[in-house]
Swiss-Prot record:
Matching PROSITE patterns: AP_NUCLEASE_F2_2, AP_NUCLEASE_F2_3, AP_NUCLEASE_F2_4
Cofactor: Zn(2+)
Protein name: Probable endonuclease 4
Biological process, per Gene Ontology: base-excision repair
Database matches in PANTHER family: APURINIC-APYRIMIDINIC ENDONUCLEASE, ENDONUCLEASE IV ENDODEOXYRIBONUCLEASE IV
Keywords: DNA damage, DNA repair, Endonuclease, Hydrolase, Metal-binding, Nuclease, Zinc
Cofactor note: Binds 3 Zn(2+) ions.
Alphabetical list of Pfam families matching this protein: AP_endonuc_2
Entry's EC annotation: 3.1.21.2
Name of the encoding gene: nfo
CDD domains listed in its UniProt record: AP2Ec (cd00019)
Catalytic activity from the UniProt record: Endonucleolytic cleavage to 5'-phosphooligonucleotide end-products
Length: 277
């Protein structure tokens, strides 16, 4: 069974997101844990949570994915920005425990000319501050395209962060297909090699989710502009190979390129039609 969903608005609660996911043929979804620009999160509605968990169990949902706000920059040169990232993630992870055993994704951040090593240290320090032994949520580092001074453009950078995290079993990776394509990993012509590289450097046991996005940009452009499935430089054949790869096919896939629900429904129907496992 293809584990597939898209990014949905959390404004009407978890049960509503679950119902929307089902209505478009999905069995999971991604959501922002708060406004993507980082304002205060909504109050937890425990009745809504309870109803969603029942709905998810009845409909055999895969793990859902909470996405941290874009403003979270754990490796900023500004100490206040780094402290803000710690507080946001700490609060988000406490809230994620209302929906236990799920996933929480964040962009590692930009080191802003401090250097990669300092950036990696700050990110690791944040994770060592916020992670708790008793948490059930797995925190995911997202692969990045390499715009500016972004950390996470290479598998080696992500591995170095993981190596410095004390509770490393609480941390994994979310692979964004647009980002790795734009970062210079040839998932179109040499997907097997890229998967082998990931396994050798990080380990496939750490790969927990995939952001399934096509790319507006040429290979290795370091641009990060998503395109709808089959309409970009990865192409439908490239996407088909990804969702059917034996080492990737059982992971949850999340569509992120902005779309209407009807558009996501069409993409999910298309993906199901080319899914062969």
């Amino acid at each position: 069974m293809l584990k597939i969903g898209c990014h949905l608005s959390a404004s009407k609660g978890f049960k509503n997101m679950g119902e929307e996911a089902i209505s478009i043929g999905g069995n999971t979804f991604q959501f922002f844990t708060r406004n993507p620009r980082g304002s205060k999160a909504k109050t937890i509605d425990e009745t809504d949570i309870k109803e969603f968990l029942k709905l998810a169990e009845e409909n055999n949902f895969s793990k859902i994915l909470g996405h941290a706000p874009y403003t979270l920059n754990a490796c900023s040169a500004d100490e206040n920005t780094r402290n803000f990232a710690v507080e946001i993630m700490k609060d988000d992870l406490e809230r994620m425990e209302y929906i236990p055993n799920n996933l929480y994704n964040f962009h590692p951040g930009s080191h802003v000319k401090q250097g990669v090593e300092i950036g990696i240290k700050y990110i690791s320090d944040m994770l060592n501050t916020v992670l708790k032994p008793e948490q059930t949520t797995t925190v995911l580092l997202e692969t990045m395209a390499g715009k500016g001074t972004e950390i996470g453009r290479t598998f080696d950078e992500l591995k170095e962060i993981l190596n410095n995290v004390e509770l490393s079993h609480k941390v994994g990776v979310c692979l964004d297909t647009c980002h790795v394509h734009d970062a210079g990993y040839d998932i179109v012509n040499n997907l097997d090699k890229v998967v082998e590289q990931f396994d050798k450097i990080i380990g496939l046991d750490k790969l927990c989710a995939i952001h399934l996005n096509d790319s507006m940009n040429p290979f290795g452009s370091h641009k990060d502009r998503h395109q709808k499935i089959g309409e970009g430089s990865i192409g439908l054949e490239g996407i088909k190979n990804i969702i059917n790869h034996p080492m990737l096919c059982n992971l949850p896939f999340f569509l992120e390129t902005p779309n209407e629900l009807d558009g996501y429904a069409r993409e999910i129907k298309l993906l199901k039609s080319i899914y062969q496992n």
